């Protein structure tokens, strides 16, 4: 995944950008970078790995050595960014957030038809952000170039550029799958993935960039260069999983959505007659916790933290690329409260069940510490498809998805014809899917939030949400 923060100011903005990037550390653990503009020095850039050292430690001295009135910084789990590029537009810094799935075709066109070349390599592969810059450069200006990029890519791309005059151009991806939010202060403007960061640094909410919209930001004003469109497909997973609890996207707060989502799940369990006789409701931390609070409030059962995640030295474990690393980190940071586990019937809510490996270890851990029963609820529907538009999951093959693996075990690839039935817990296939996962992971019971319930909890029109990973619909 990744996140970004930038400022255009009348004064040095490096402190603001340092803290602004740090507040996006939950979105990645691999790379971080910053580019800034100073009228005397010009453009500067630094990129470092943050796999073993947190951003604030790795970049503290870096920011002390840089100065500028304009800066953008990012967390990136894909390629080193931002890049400094020199083209017919002059020198500029560029950052891209998204996922492009037809890069091989685009690279071939670039080599064969334009006789281009690339300088930046990542593990022997072409840096996708440099490819993005090369495509933009094919047109006569940034606006036409970004629109051309959106026309030919498969996937999504939000673009942020620092021009050589110190202004920022920001373009939200064509269907607005991820947010670009702007705040205003007396000395200038900031742009951010997470809305809460703007307020923490003294910026008042000013504007959410629309899907496909392109704006230019100076210290004095924000100018729309291209209006974009009305159609939106913002990622619904922002609210259920990876968005920060204090943020809002399209006016809908993450924490409140999770409370409401849990409430709807508990209500559905009551209606379907599958509410459980339990001692406590708990959340799989961190993002499962507010879903669980909502579930507990509606069910009338007490909420309790049967285990605590040790966070001072362990970062989020969904990011490391190997399953072994993810499992080890997940296990190391779980600390039990035995008095809340031993002899107890527990119901846990997790934000999602993707591969299921870590969740199995969590349930085994609870049984090892004396749990009598462990019931599980997923705050979103079964994940049936890998995302084609964003890189928020470490899964590379769809057969890593537990729902797909179970379907193949039950009736082979023929079962893929009945994905909708498997997602629905009321159908025979849906019941078999849940029963098989229960047997594999030792759950006493399992249910998933329905897609309708999830959309209701978010509170946006269904047509404005991307739900591809659950139903395969574009």
Language-model regions, residue ranges each:
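Conserved short alpha-helical segments that host acidic/polar catalytic motifs at enzyme active sites
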Residues: 1-210, 216-279, 284, 373
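Active-site proximal loops enriched in glycine and acidic residues that flank catalytic Cys/His/Asp
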Residues: 172, 193, 219, 282-286, ...
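Flexible loop/turn segments at secondary-structure boundaries
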Residues: 12-14, 102, 168, 177-178, ...
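Phosphate/diphosphate-binding loops
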Residues: 197, 204, 212, 267-273, ...
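Hydrophobic, well-ordered secondary-structure elements that form the walls
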Residues: 265, 295, 351-352, 374
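Short, glycine/charge-rich flexible loops or terminal/linker lids adjacent to PRPP-binding catalytic cores
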Residues: 297-345, 384-396
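Long, K/E/R/D-enriched contiguous segments that form extended
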Residues: 271, 276-317
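PRPP-dependent phosphoribosyltransferase catalytic core
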Residues: 165-167, 172, 202-206, 363-474
């Amino acid at each position: 995944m990744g996140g970004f923060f930038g400022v255009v100011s009348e004064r040095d903005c490096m402190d603001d950008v340092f803290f602004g990037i740090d507040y996006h550390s939950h979105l990645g653990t691999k790379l971080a970078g910053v580019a800034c503009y100073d009228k005397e020095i010009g453009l500067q850039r630094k990129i470092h790995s943050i796999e073993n050292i947190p951003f604030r430690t790795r970049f503290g001295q870096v920011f002390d050595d840089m100065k500028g009135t304009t800066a953008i910084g990012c967390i990136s789990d894909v390629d080193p960014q931002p890049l400094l590029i020199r083209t017919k537009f002059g020198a500029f810094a560029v950052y891209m957030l998204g996922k492009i799935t037809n890069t091989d075709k685009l690279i071939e066109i670039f080599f064969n038809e334009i006789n281009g070349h690339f300088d930046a390599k990542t593990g022997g592969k072409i840096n996708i952000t440099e490819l993005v810059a090369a495509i933009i450069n094919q047109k006569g200006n940034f606006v036409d170039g970004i629109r051309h990029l959106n026309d030919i890519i498969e996937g999504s791309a939000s673009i942020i550029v620092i021009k050589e005059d110190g202004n920022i151009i920001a373009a939200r991806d064509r269907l607005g799958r991820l947010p670009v939010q702007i705040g205003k202060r007396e000395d200038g403007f900031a742009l951010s993935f997470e809305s809460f960061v703007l307020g923490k640094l003294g910026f008042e909410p000013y504007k959410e960039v629309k899907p496909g919209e392109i704006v230019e930001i100076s210290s004095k004003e924000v100018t729309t260069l291209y209006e974009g469109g009305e159609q939106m497909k913002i990622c619904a997973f922002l609210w259920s999983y990876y968005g920060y609890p204090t943020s809002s996207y399209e006016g809908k707060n993450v924490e409140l959505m999770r409370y409401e989502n849990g409430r709807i799940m508990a209500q559905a369990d009551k209606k379907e007659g599958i509410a459980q006789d339990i001692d406590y409701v708990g959340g799989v931390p961190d993002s499962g916790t507010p879903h669980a609070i909502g579930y507990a409030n509606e069910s009338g059962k007490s909420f309790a933290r049967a285990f605590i995640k040790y966070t001072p030295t362990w970062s989020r474990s969904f990011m490391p690329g190997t399953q072994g690393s993810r499992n080890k980190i997940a296990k190391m940071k779980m600390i039990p409260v035995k008095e809340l586990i031993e002899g107890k019937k527990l119901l846990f809510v997790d934000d999602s069940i993707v591969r299921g490996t870590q969740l199995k270890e969590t349930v085994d851990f609870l049984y090892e510490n004396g749990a009598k029963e462990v019931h599980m609820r997923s705050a979103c529907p079964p994940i049936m498809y890998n995302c084609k538009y964003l890189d928020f999951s470490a899964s590379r093959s769809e057969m890593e998805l537990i729902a797909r693996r179970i379907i193949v075990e039950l009736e082979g690839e023929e079962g893929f014809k009945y994905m909708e039935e498997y997602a629905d817990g009321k159908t025979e296939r849906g019941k078999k899917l849940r029963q098989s996962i229960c047997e594999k992971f030792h759950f006493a019971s399992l249910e998933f939030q329905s897609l309708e319930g999830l959309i209701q909890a978010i509170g946006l029109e269904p047509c404005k949400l991307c739900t591809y990973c659950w139903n395969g619909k574009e």
